[in-house]
């Protein structure tokens, strides 16, 4: 089924398509139960539904949501918001550009783990504040890229990769299954020459998180080896149907 409406989105261009076509098919076939935390207008939730997922959308702002699918109003700063959504119900938890908005990122991650059913997988994205452009900006101006006064006002929690993997995930009882950067080898900038300079500098410096404007993170529960695994039969571009 194709959506008659396509709600707008402020997410990085192409990120939703990347998740649907290149990432999710490595772990799932469509048809499982999924929840979109921080659904916004409903753009990603609609695409998940149209691809065959059984989707629930959740967000604090009811007024922005325009997709005709089930929606629950939730405050992600609540200590146990998972209790309102159904602990252990979801094979897939998606949260695109949300964790940087919450007051307690470890608490947010714990709630994500509670929502996962055994073998379930969570997919998060967040601005890459470890990138070369971010490091250059902090060196020159002392401000964090995509977190400064010119950025989204509700960006309050920068996610630094070393701290995230070394402290946040163990405390939330989650384990890292996969880490991607988007765009994979570059940056989305208004000045192409500047993006080229940043790529050149990144190649000289070396390091895992120097490229890309966004972290794309796949997580599973670390409790009793309950994490999901990539599905070798579901690799390649996702077309809305599956051979699984």
What are these regions (language model features)?
Residues 107-121:
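A short glycine-rich, Lys/Arg-flanked "PGG" loop and its adjoining helix->strand segment in the class I
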